[in-house]
Swiss-Prot record:
Family label: Belongs to the germin family.
Localization, UniProt: Secreted, Extracellular space, Apoplast; Secreted, Cell wall
GO cellular component, one term: apoplast
Function recorded in the entry: May subsume the role of germin at the low water potentials during embryogenesis.
Subunit structure: Homotetramer.
Keyword Secreted assigned: yes
Keywords linked to the UniProt accession: Apoplast, Cell wall, Secreted
Protein name: Pseudogermin
Length: 21
């Protein structure tokens, strides 16, 4: 996914980006 979880947490991988969000 992307290095910035707040960049596109809903657009990219939810299991890798917004995991922490």
């Amino acid at each position: 996914a992307d290095p910035d979880p707040l960049q596109d947490f809903x657009v990219a991988d939810l299991x890798d980006n917004a995991v922490x969000v």
